[in-house]
Regions:
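Non-transmembrane amphipathic alpha-helical segments
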Residues: 6, 10-20, 39, 129
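Short coil/turn segments at helix-helix junctions and helix-capping linkers
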Residues: 23-27
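Extended, helix-rich structural scaffolds rather than catalytic motifs
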Residues: 1-8, 45-196
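Short amphipathic alpha-helical coiled-coil/interface segments
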Residues: 10, 29-43, 155-160
Length: 196
């Protein structure tokens, strides 16, 4: 496919995603967003190429996100593992703030937005599912709180590990090259930030 055909296809998917969100079809919006991400990654494109606007060029610069609270009630570190996996998939880097349960994310504006959306969505979904799965597994049995917490921590850690495996299995050699490029830009930004 030539570049313009790919750009047209991505623009149609963006309109589909926005339309699905407007009518409240979260599943269709997520499917369209995943297809957009896959095409952008596969063909090594940037948002500025798709939108063709100077504003999009400005969005591609590296920046730092707000703090992500990664502490969890079970001290298993599942939120941190989830954030790291999502960051790696979206060409960002996450770092723990010393002495706190918080992380910051470095990357392009669009990638950081994707990380924030995916992290918030998956964190809420996994937390909700963990309670449902616990009730399915144990029914009406009385389980000590400590055992329940261990079970939930194990389930949530398994969810974050499963997401990591799924995201990493979708990578190709082209994606690896793009990751190295973004990694170098992030390292350069961090060096400049520390130097000033």
């Amino acid at each position: 496919m030539d570049k313009q055909t790919i750009i047209n296809k991505i623009q149609k998917l963006i309109r589909l995603r926005d339309g699905a969100r407007a009518v409240g079809s979260e599943g269709e919006a997520n499917a369209a967003a995943a297809a957009i991400q896959r095409l952008i990654t596969e063909y090594n494109m940037s948002l500025s190429e798709i939108e063709g606007t100077p504003e999009a060029e400005e969005e591609s610069c590296i920046g730092r996100s707000n703090n992500y609270h990664t502490a969890d009630n079970y001290r298993s570190g599942w939120k941190r593992h989830l954030l790291y996996a999502i960051c790696e998939y979206y060409y960002c880097k996450a770092y723990m703030l010393s002495g706190t349960p918080r992380c910051v994310v470095y990357g392009t504006e669009m990638n950081r937005m994707a990380v924030e959306y995916a992290f918030n969505f998956l964190e809420a979904a996994f937390t909700h599912l963990s309670v449902i799965r616990f009730k399915e597994a144990h029914g009406t049995c009385r389980i000590p709180t400590r055992h329940r917490d261990v079970w939930l921590a194990s389930y949530l850690l398994g969810c974050s590990s499963g997401i990591r495996e799924k995201l990493m299995s979708e990578k190709t050699e082209q994606v690896t090259g793009l990751m190295i490029s973004h990694g170098a830009m992030i390292d350069k930004y961090m060096a400049q930030e520390q130097g000033s």
